Structure formats: structure tokens, C-alpha cells
Amino acid sequence: MRQPDSSLPRTGQDHTLSPYEPELGEVPSNDLSMADLDNVNKTGTTTIGISTAEGVVIATDMRASLGGRFVSNKNVQKVEQIHPSAALTLVGSVGGAQSFIRSLRAEVDLYEARRGEDISINALATLAGNFARGGPFFAINPILGGVDDEGHHVYSIDPAGGVMKDDYTVTGSGLTVAYGTLEREYEDDMTNEEAKRVAASGIKAAVERDTGSGNGVFLATVTDEDVEIKGHKDFDEVL
């Protein structure tokens, strides 16, 4: 039997070759215990992604908690621009989610530099899924929304690396409450402004019942030209 080449990159977790390693090098590892994770800042969270006739709208709450018992921050921006026409939410531990986004941005830049073309949103979602499965990012469950030549896309990415596309999706601790609002208010071919109101309504409903969500809403509007992100402490500003 042929032995693995010891000169090839290996993961820091089990020292076996991984098909999910990024092109830039190894996915970073961690040695945190379950007790350590209880003291990690977590987003808790409710995040929503909606595909519209004009692009994509993403909404998140603003709360971070420590060990699920203490509100450690009331102004966390849980959605970040990941590409000129795509945005990604932060769900899970704050540090893990931020590391995930930094790593993914670097990989996208490398992908486009090597190929001389923009990455498609489908390829970006696949890359994000590979990272979620192969990296120590503490069970993140983000939403990716983007626009490319093929249309407007919303993907949910599960901790095992699964990538699922839908017209709208919800992740986070408040998803059961928010889904009820979206099932009632979502319509095909909404404008971005209409979708922002529906998404904000879903976040508000989750904030009322989910202790991991709260303190306002961030709304991201994604078009083929740019990503605009704005925070609102008062839901009445957008409803």
C-alpha cells in the first residue's frame, strides 16, 4: 500500500490528510475543551436570508452572549460583506465565525487571482461548506446571500458542510419563531424594500421569545453592484 507523502499539508486535529484544506495552507486548529467553550462569546442569534426580484436581503439581530447566560454585547454586526456582491452571516461563536470569514475571504481572493474571473455564488457556497466541515469553527451555521450572472441566491450552510439553496431561510436559536413570520409574510418577487420589512419582522418576532436574540436588527441589501449594511436599534425604523 502506498504511504501518504509526509511533505503534504496535514490538519492540526488528527494528522491525517484532509480533502477540505484551503489552498493557502492548513485550516487552523484549536484545543479548547467543552468547559472552555462555555466561556466563549457566542452570537446565539437569529439570521434571515431572502431572495428578491432585485437581489438578496439578509437580516440579523445584534446580541452576543457569554455561556448562554450573560449578554456580553448589544451591538454585534452579524452580517459581513464576503465578496463585492455577496454577504455572509455570523452564527456560532464570535471568534470562530470571524475566523471563518477571514479565511473564506482569503480563499476567494486566491481563487479569483488564479482563475482571472469572479467566483460564482454557487462556487462560493461550496467553498464555504467545505470550510465549515473541515475547520474548527465551533458549529457555525451561516447564511450566504449573493448575486451573480446566474441570478439571486440564498444558501444555508450547516456545521457538517451541507449547502442548501432556497428562496428564503433562517438559522440560529430563534429560527422556529422567525420561520412562522416568513411563512406568513413571504411572497415571490418582492422588492428589496418589501423583503427588508418582512425580514425585520421575522427578527423582531424572534427577539420577543428567544433569549439568544435581541437588541436590534442589522439589514444587508445585496445587489449586482454592492452590499449595503445598516443597523437599527428601533424596529419601527424599518417596519
Curated annotation (Swiss-Prot):
UniProt name for this protein: Proteasome subunit beta
PANTHER family linked to this entry: ATP-DEPENDENT PROTEASE SUBUNIT HSLV, METALLOPROTEASE TLDD
Keywords, ordered alphabetically: Autocatalytic cleavage, Cytoplasm, Hydrolase, Protease, Proteasome, Threonine protease, Zymogen
Subcellular location per the Swiss-Prot or TrEMBL entry: Cytoplasm
Described purpose of this protein according to its UniProt entry: Component of the proteasome core, a large protease complex with broad specificity involved in protein degradation.
Mechanisms controlling activity: The formation of the proteasomal ATPase PAN-20S proteasome complex, via the docking of the C-termini of PAN into the intersubunit pockets in the alpha-rings, triggers opening of the gate for substrate entry. Interconversion between the open-gate and close-gate conformations leads to a dynamic regulation of the 20S proteasome proteolysis activity.
Species assigned in the record: Natronomonas pharaonis (strain ATCC 35678 / DSM 2160 / CIP 103997 / JCM 8858 / NBRC 14720 / NCIMB 2260 / Gabara) (Halobacterium pharaonis)
HAMAP family: Proteasome_B_A
GO molecular function: threonine-type endopeptidase activity
Superkingdom of origin: Archaea
Residue ranges annotated as propeptide in the record: 1-44
Gene Ontology biological process: proteasomal protein catabolic process
Region annotation Disordered: where it falls in the sequence: 1-32
Catalysis performed (reactions): Cleavage of peptide bonds with very broad specificity
Assigned EC number: 3.4.25.1
Annotated InterPro entries: Ntn_hydrolases_N (IPR029055), Pept_T1A_Psome_bsu_arc (IPR019983), Pept_T1A_subB (IPR000243), Proteasome_sua/b (IPR001353), Proteasome_suB-type (IPR023333)
Similarity annotation: Belongs to the peptidase T1B family.
GO cellular component: cytoplasm; proteasome core complex, beta-subunit complex
Main location: cytoplasm
Catalytic-site annotation from UniProt: 45 (nucleophile)
NCBIfam families: arc_protsome_B (TIGR03634)
Lineage, highest ranks first: Archaea, Methanobacteriati, Methanobacteriota, Stenosarchaea group, Halobacteria
Subunit structure, as described in the record: The 20S proteasome core is composed of 14 alpha and 14 beta subunits that assemble into four stacked heptameric rings, resulting in a barrel-shaped structure. The two inner rings, each composed of seven catalytic beta subunits, are sandwiched by two outer rings, each composed of seven alpha subunits. The catalytic chamber with the active sites is on the inside of the barrel. Has a gated structure, the ends of the cylinder being occluded by the N-termini of the alpha-subunits. Is capped at one or both ends by the proteasome regulatory ATPase, PAN.
Composition skew (Polar residues), residue ranges: 1-16
